[in-house]
């Protein structure tokens, strides 16, 4: 029974995309990604009574150049939706919204699995910035320092046409150094790119 269901799903999936799809062509490309990110913010980061959610709706736009079927380089801008802290410093009514954004520079090695499916990894650096500190009773909360951090991730792409791939990806910005550095982020996304050739 399970085998029949699996076969039907694979059959439907295989015909959901154009039959003549083939690998992306080398050249410049633009990429848009949407998804959710774990900002690893906690109410305790601001001694707050609560936060709305540490999971943030997130978007990323990027431009890159694919040298061949195995290597690309990418630069991107990521914007995380705000995390709202309520009762900062344990004081009711002392609220603040924290916004985070990042600029990244990534090498992107790729492994073709078939003519139109690729596994890829990303490795590089990201500049992470946060705005939204608050001073309550003389104490500064969420006064994060902007910082350069390592960034890495993995993904799977499918070429709908040679010019238009879709992808699923996970990207992490790894906070280093401790202190008042912004916590790490984990971004889970679906994306669509366009290759100019």
Predicted regions, residues:
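A short, acidic/glycine-rich surface segment
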Residues: 42-43, 176-178
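Cleavable N-terminal export/targeting peptides
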Residues: 1-27, 197
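Short, basic, glycine/proline-bearing loop/turn elements
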Residues: 45-47
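Generic marker of residues within folded, mature protein domains
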Residues: 13, 22, 53, 65, ...
């Amino acid at each position: 029974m399970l085998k029949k269901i699996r076969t039907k799903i694979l059959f439907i999936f295989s015909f959901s995309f154009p039959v003549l799809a083939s690998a992306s062509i080398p050249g410049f490309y633009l990429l848009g990604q949407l998804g959710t990110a774990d900002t690893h913010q906690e109410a305790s980061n601001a001694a707050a009574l609560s936060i709305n959610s540490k999971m943030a709706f997130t978007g990323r736009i990027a431009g890159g150049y694919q040298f061949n079927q195995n290597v690309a380089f990418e630069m991107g801008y990521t914007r995380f939706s705000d995390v709202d802290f309520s009762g900062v410093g344990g004081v009711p009514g002392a609220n603040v919204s924290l916004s985070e954004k990042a600029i990244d520079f990534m090498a992107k090695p790729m492994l073709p699995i078939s003519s139109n499916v690729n596994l890829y990894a990303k490795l590089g650096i990201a500049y992470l910035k946060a705005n939204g500190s608050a001073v309550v009773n003389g104490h500064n909360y969420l006064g994060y320092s902007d910082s350069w951090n390592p960034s890495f991730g993995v993904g799977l792409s499918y070429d709908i046409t040679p010019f238009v791939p879709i992808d699923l990806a996970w990207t992490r910005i790894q906070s280093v150094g401790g202190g008042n550095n912004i916590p790490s982020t984990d971004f889970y996304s679906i994306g669509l790119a366009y290759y100019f050739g």
